Amino acid sequence: LRLLQRDPTDLGLTALLDAHRRPQPRLVLGRLALSAGVRCGMDVSDGLVGDLQKICAASGLAAEVRLSDIPVPALVREAFPEGWAELGLAGGEDYELLLVAPGEVLAAVAERSDVPLTTIGVIGAGLPGRVTVRDARGNTLNLERMGWDHLDGRA
C-alpha cells in the first residue's frame, strides 16, 4: 500500500509494484522443500513476524530473528529509509516462504533451488509464540505492528 501511495517512477519502484500486483508464489520451492524433509513452513503474505508468531505458537516454541539478515530489497530501503525495517518485518504481501527446519535440511534445499535461501534466525525453547527481533547491536526491537490479522482486520 505504501508503494501505491508514491509516484511509481520514484526510485524505479515499478519492479516492486509489479511484484505486488502479480505475485509469484514459490510453489516449486515449496515442493522442493517438502521433498528435502522440511516439515514446517508457510507463506509470508501476512507479515514475517506475524506469520512466524503463528508457527511458534502452534509449535510451542519461540524465535529470535536478526534484522540485519532479513533480505529487504535495496529499493525498499532507499524509498523508505525510516520505515524499511517495519515493512520487512510486518509489511506482508511478500508471498515468500518461511521455512523452519534443521540447518542441514535447509542446506539441501538451497543446493537444489534456484531461489536463494536466507537464514534469518533460530527457533527453540521459550515462551510459545514469542518472536524477538534484534538489531545489529543485539538490542531488542519493539514492533508496534506484527502483521495482518484476518480475524480482527488490523495490521
Model-predicted regions and their roles:
Residues 1-31:
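Short, acidic (Asp/Glu-rich) active-site segment that either coordinates a divalent metal cofactor
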Residues 12-15, 35-155:
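Glycine-/charge-enriched secondary-structure boundary and capping motifs
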